[in-house]
Design a protein with these regions (language model features):
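Core catalytic lobe of class I
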Residues: 1-161
Length: 161
């Protein structure tokens, strides 16, 4: 592995239009990382977060089908969501023919909720799906976090490539 990162760049505009252009141009990506609107009924000025559930599910299905078209054969999609809607995204990924790798959690110390009537959420789930069932890229050494306390390990962990 050459440890190079290729940056496509920031693209501003309607992501649905942009993805259509990428499909037309034959662009392919090894990784798509997306953090789309969560449909949590908040007013961000464009109604993208206030859809009826059926519309949210249909739009999510269409977006994932399009994103699959711009994945390389060994490419992956990482999709951030919110706990009460991520299940619909997961089903859409399966329906698009993608393969489940993991659901992980992004944990943060300070939650986003300003509510005093319920606990703040201190995490966001994200899904990792690949385009191929047996071949995908995952560079574990680059993302591995060392143990904070090695004293609790009875024997060193050995990884085999």
């Amino acid at each position: 592995m050459n440890n190079e990162i290729y940056l496509f760049g920031n693209i501003c505009g309607d992501s649905d239009v942009i993805v259509d252009q990428l499909i037309e141009n034959g662009q392919k990506f090894d990784l798509i990382l997306t953090d789309p609107p969560y449909n949590i009924n908040k007013d961000f000025g464009n109604n993208s977060d206030c859809l009826p559930l059926d519309d949210f599910i249909n739009i999510t299905n269409e977006r994932i089908k399009k994103l699959k078209q711009v994945l390389t054969p060994t490419g992956s999609i990482i999709w951030f969501g919110i706990h009460n809607y991520i299940c619909y995204v997961q089903v859409a990924m399966y329906n698009a023919g993608l393969f489940y790798r993991r659901m992980n959690i992004w944990h943060y110390e300070n939650g986003f909720s300003r509510s005093t009537k319920e606990p703040a959420t201190h995490y966001e789930p994200f899904l990792w799906f690949s385009n191929d069932k047996k071949k995908w890229v995952y560079n574990c050494d680059e993302v591995r976090i060392p143990y904070k306390s090695t004293e609790r390990l009875k024997s060193p962990v050995k990884y085999h490539a």
